[in-house]
Amino acid sequence: TAIGNCNPFTCDKECKTKGNKRGYCENYNCECSKW
């Protein structure tokens, strides 16, 4: 994901691929959540 731009759908998909529960955008960054 480019700096200053976060796609919530792409972020969620990437996080789930890494074994996380979900992904969300915070301060334009992709954050992964394990719960």
UniProtKB/Swiss-Prot annotation:
* UniProt keyword annotation of Magnesium present: no
| Expression tissues | Expressed by the venom gland.
- What GO cellular component entries does it have? extracellular region
Superkingdom is: Eukaryota
Transmembrane annotation, as ranges: none
Q: Where does the protein principally reside?
A: secreted
Enumerate the SUPFAM superfamilies for this protein. Answer: Scorpion toxin-like
Q: Does the keyword Zinc apply?
A: no
Checking InterPro entries in the record gives: Scorpion_toxin-like_sf (IPR036574)
Covalent S-S links between cysteines: C6-C25, C11-C30, C15-C32
Q: Where in the cell is it found?
A: Secreted
List the molecular function annotations (GO) for this entry: potassium channel regulator activity; toxin activity
Alphabetically list the UniProt keywords: Disulfide bond, Ion channel impairing toxin, Neurotoxin, Potassium channel impairing toxin, Secreted, Toxin, Voltage-gated potassium channel impairing toxin
The record's similarity note reads: Belongs to the short scorpion toxin superfamily. Potassium channel inhibitor family. Alpha-KTx 21 subfamily.
The entry's function note states: Toxin that blocks voltage-gated potassium channels (Kv).
Record comment regarding domains: Has the structural arrangement of an alpha-helix connected to antiparallel beta-sheets by disulfide bonds (CS-alpha/beta).
Q: What is this protein called?
A: Potassium channel toxin
Q: Which organism was this protein described from? A: Tityus metuendus
